[in-house]
Amino acid sequence: MIQAISKLMSFDEFLEWKTENSRYELHNGVVVEMQTTGKHEEVVEFLQTELTLETRRMQLPYRFPRNALVKSPSQETGYLPDILVVKRDALVLEPLWEKSSTITHGSSIPLIIEVVSTNWRDDYAHKMIEYEALGIPEYWIVDYLGLGGSRYIGSPKQPTLLVYQLVDGEYQIKLFRGDERVESLAFSELNLTAKQIFSGLLVR
């Protein structure tokens, strides 16, 4: 669920305004408070824990900043992803990282994940377009309630995990459901099914 705040801001003003650990995004100058449910938090926590363990197991050069923003290159827009995976050595090249915990280069981000709440149109449309334009190589939409439009997840609607992977500058989409193992470029040996992620339980 989201709640808008009625004051237009530039991205720089937004950075000055927001407080540390606050859950806000900037959508074309509009400040939006991100409000989540308990189940949403369970799915995010489970998935981030599993990806962190996989990073350690495979000795991958990744970090998981919890409150970092991803800035759009062309608009007064900054997103606060549910899970953001960044390359450790790329952070020194990010001009806003030290001061504002903000990522501006898509090449710094091997994977970005959004867990769908009632604002599913943002995840499926606006954010997908922005992440593709930034050149982020992999984007997951975790729709554990099957809320997205039927054009995205089919009909009848059902829980679906969508993996967008960048090919020649455009996202190609794969859908995963039930006991299907999720295929990832950033985590090539990850052994998780869509069902495990939706339930937030590791049952092998």
Which residues does each PLM region occupy?
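Gly/Pro/Ser/Thr-rich low-complexity, intrinsically disordered segments predominantly at protein N-termini
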Residues: 1-204
